[in-house]
Amino acid sequence: MEEFEPTIIAFVCNWCTYTAADLAGTSRLTYPKNVRLIRVMCTGMVDPQYIIKAFLEGADGVLVSGCHPGDCHYINGNYKARRRIKLLKEILPQFGFDQQRLRLTWIGASDGIQFAEIMRELVTQVKALGPSQAKLKMVI
């Protein structure tokens, strides 16, 4: 039997986290290949329905990552994201998903090392949770 490798969808801010991911790549830092980056202009633009859809389509974990509070290119986008993620974590169990499968982080543009570390940590955390229930239902 194959070892479970989780699928992680990461919504990343164009101005900070995506730049950190690029820096990690150019610095030849490694992070798991099962993390799929979706670049958004700001984490404040990530609608909760995109996160729920990612889970319903079989993602084992979702990351939303952007600029540190106070450093948002769009002034308050990361504050909006923080409020949305907090509310979404409260309702995820109603959809049958463990709230530990959703994570919000702040990664600055020059934090390539931190980006790679967070990706590895997230994959390890989600791997310990096992496959998402939506994915198990799709197989049946």
What are these regions (language model features)?
Residues 1-140:
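Iron-sulfur-associated redox domains of electron-transfer enzymes in respiratory
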